């Protein structure tokens, strides 16, 4: 695992297909631990993982903390309501406090875009070896969610060999609030890297036309795309035109807390035009799964009966895949850091 190339995990745009394969392979192995009877591994014993969540979270925070504990790491949790932020302490100074207490990994979530990247840069400039893992920042990225969604789809399409090639040539439809979704952005990088064609569906106010070119060029700061040939991204306005031929459908929560202006006439009209139901899913054909990163607005993004139907809903499967996926990320980052420390000791001796 010493070949893992990422000191920090801040987005998925910099991931090669080999990087995705490394995460999926490990996550699949970790997912089988309860079956073998092993609940914990000593991989991160003696390491300290701090979860700095400046924004509310249920699934991401809980699964990162459980992932760290299953790898035998010590875990510290940060809560804004009981911190010194209310006294004027900066995000950087808060992070430095945890670094001073020995944190090896900071899992950072913040409502503002770019905070994990800035922390990683500032800590590195200070000579700190603590690594930063983005737990979701603003509208930018949610790497671990994109990876667990990838694992969920790969396991569905190829249960015996859930690797990136299971997505090659698949047509994945993502419906809803793309504009405000860091999950959608992470999935665009992940799915296209694995050769899937992604269809984005929603009203122009939530799915601007320029999203069709989202993965056409690497983002600023990344000199070149690590994926030689990506799947295509397209924008379709009507759900009945997007669903036929789909291999899987992901619907996204309407992020009303991020909508500064009136982008929808009503939730009822949104559900009428873009809400998923058993009837609508018949347009896809047989055995087409539905995903949702949660939390779900029942009766808005999809019907309650569809959400609760184990024959087609993979929502609980996504939750189950969260812990092993985040275990894989923590393991890879720790292995990379151990290799870097060994190299540093060797060069100084």
From Swiss-Prot:
Transmembrane segments: none
InterPro entries from the UniProt entry: Asp/Orn_carbamoyltranf_P-bd (IPR006132), Asp/Orn_carbamoylTrfase (IPR006130), Asp/Orn_carbamoylTrfase_sf (IPR036901), Asp_carbamoyltransf (IPR002082), Asp_carbamoyltransf_Asp/Orn-bd (IPR006131)
Pathway: Pyrimidine metabolism; UMP biosynthesis via de novo pathway; (S)-dihydroorotate from bicarbonate: step 2/3
Signal sequence annotation: none
Entry's Gene Ontology molecular function annotations: amino acid binding; aspartate carbamoyltransferase activity
Catalysed reaction, written as an equation: carbamoyl phosphate + L-aspartate = N-carbamoyl-L-aspartate + phosphate + H(+)
Gene3D superfamilies, per the entry: Aspartate/ornithine carbamoyltransferase
Binding of L-aspartate, residues: 87, 182, 253
GO biological processes: 'de novo' pyrimidine nucleobase biosynthetic process; 'de novo' UMP biosynthetic process; amino acid metabolic process
CC per GO annotation: cytosol
UniProt keyword Membrane, yes or no: no
Enzyme Commission number(s) from the entry: 2.1.3.2
PROSITE patterns linked: CARBAMOYLTRANSFERASE
Keyword Protein transport: no
Binding site for carbamoyl phosphate: 59-60, 109, 142, 145, 294-295
Record key words, sorted: Pyrimidine biosynthesis, Transferase
Enzyme class, broadest EC rank: transferase
Chain's role: Catalyzes the condensation of carbamoyl phosphate and aspartate to form carbamoyl aspartate and inorganic phosphate, the committed step in the de novo pyrimidine nucleotide biosynthesis pathway.
Family: Belongs to the aspartate/ornithine carbamoyltransferase superfamily. ATCase family.
Classification via NCBIfam families: asp_carb_tr, PRK00856.1
Subunit structure of this chain's protein: Heterododecamer (2C3:3R2) of six catalytic PyrB chains organized as two trimers (C3), and six regulatory PyrI chains organized as three dimers (R2).
Protein name, per record: Aspartate carbamoyltransferase catalytic subunit
Originating species: Synechococcus sp. (strain CC9605)
Gene name of the record: pyrB
